[in-house]
Regions:
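N-terminal pre-Walker A segment at the start of P-loop NTPase domains
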Residues: 47-80
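Phosphate-binding P-loop
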Residues: 61-66, 85-94, 233
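Short, solvent-exposed loop/turn and secondary-structure capping segments
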Residues: 66-69, 209-211, 252-256
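The Walker A (P-loop) glycine that initiates the GxxxxGKT/S ATP-binding motif of P-loop NTPases
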Residues: 99
C-alpha cells in the first residue's frame, strides 16, 4: 500500500489490500494538517490508514470547484453563472470514502467530523439508511472520547419546529430527507454560510439521482437521490463526504456525487454527466 507516514500512528489491526488498478495510480501529496487529540493517534484509536482518510478529506475540502453556479429556490435546478453574478455560489469540493468492509469507515467518518469540531465547526449532519444505525454512529463518536449524546436523531424534533441544538451531530435517514419539511428543517438548523461536515453514509442509497433512459423508456429520478442533491445544492460551502464500499453498481448511478468535480463544463474532466458515463462505459471499470 502507498501510504502517508504519520509519526506515532499505529498500523491498522487487520491486513489491508488494494487492487492492482488502484496501485497503478500514485496517490496525491496532501499538505493538510488535521487537528486531533494526541491520544487518538498514540492509543491506536485511529490507525495510520484511518488517519490518512482524515488528512485526504481535509485536503480536498480546502478548495472549491471551478466556476460559479446559480441554484433556484427549489434546489432542483442548477446552471453555470458568470463570475460575480448576483446570488451565484461556488461549491466546495467533496471527498469519496470508498474503503471496503473492515476498514472502520464509521470511525473514519467520526475522525473527519472531530477534526472539524476542534476547528470550531460544531454542527454536522450524518445521513444513513436506517435510524437504528445511530447506535453505531454514537459508538464511533464516543470511541474518540466524545460524548455520544452529541449525536442526536432528527426524529427527536417535531416536523416544522426548529432543531434546538447549539452544537452536535444530527443523525438523519435518507427516507426522512425525502420529506420536504424535514429537508428544510435540516437546512435551517445549519444556517447560511454553513461550512461544516455533511456525511452521506451508504451513499449508493442515492442511486438514480438524475434519472435515466433505458430499454423500457425514461426512468424518473429517485426521491432519495433527488433529496441528496437538493441538500448539497442548498449548502454550497458544506464539506461533503460520500461513504460507500460500492459507490454504484452502474456508473450512471454516480449522479449524486456532484461535488467530486468529474463533470460540469469545459474546466472539468468531462463537460457533462452523459460524457462521463460514455467514457467510463467505453473504457470499462477496473
Amino acid at each position: 500500500l502507498q501510504s502517508i507516514r504519520i509519526e506515532g500512528a499505529k498500523p491498522h489491526p487487520t491486513k489491508l489490500v488494494q487492487s492492482a488498478a488502484m496501485a497503478s495510480v500514485a496517490p496525491p501529496h496532501p499538505s493538510y494538517r488535521p487537528h486531533l487529540p494526541v491520544h487518538i493517534i498514540k492509543s491506536d484509536i485511529l490507525s495510520d490508514a484511518q488517519l490518512e482518510s482524515v488528512i485526504y478529506a481535509g485536503d480536498v475540502h480546502s478548495g472549491h470547484l471551478v466556476g460559479s453556479w446559480a441554484v433556484d429556490e427549489t434546489f432542483d435546478n442548477i446552471h453555470a453563472a458568470p463570475e460575480g453574478a448576483e446570488n451565484a455560489v461556488r461549491f466546495r469540493r467533496g471527498w469519496f470514502l470508498g474503503d471496503g468492509t473492515g476498514c472502520g469507515k464509521g470511525r473514519q467518518v467520526a475522525g473527519i467530523i472531530l477534526d472539524n469540531w476542534i476547528k470550531g465547526r460544531r454542527k454536522a449532519v450524518w445521513i444513513s439508511k436506517s435510524d437504528k444505525l445511530i447506535e453505531d454512529a454514537q459508538r464511533d463518536w464516543s470511541a474518540l472520547g466524545m460524548e455520544q449524546l452529541l449525536v442526536q436523531p432528527l426524529s427527536r424534533f417535531k416536523q416544522g419546529t426548529p432543531v434546538r441544538l447549539t452544537e452536535g451531530v444530527l443523525f438523519v435517514t435518507y427516507a426522512t430527507l425525502r420529506n420536504e419539511p424535514r429537508l428544510r428543517q435540516v437546512i435551517d438548523w445549519l444556517g447560511d454560510g454553513f461550512d461544516g461536515v455533511v456525511v452521506f453514509d451508504e451513499a449508493h442509497a442515492m442511486a438514480n439521482a438524475a434519472g435515466s433512459k433505458g430499454e423500457r423508456g425514461e426512468q424518473l429520478p429517485s426521491q432519495q437521490g433527488r433529496a441528496g442533491l437538493r441538500l448539497q445544492r442548498a449548502l454550497p460551502d458544506a464539506r461533503i463526504v460520500y461513504v460507500s464500499a460500492t459507490g454504484a453498481t452502474d456508473v450512471r448511478n454516480l449522479a449524486y456525487a456532484e461535488r467530486l468535480g468529474l463533470w460540469g463544463g469545459e474546466d472539468f474532466p468531462f463537460a457533462n454527466r452523459t460524457e462521463f458515463v460514455q467514457a467510463v462505459e467505453a473504457g470499462g471499470v477496473a
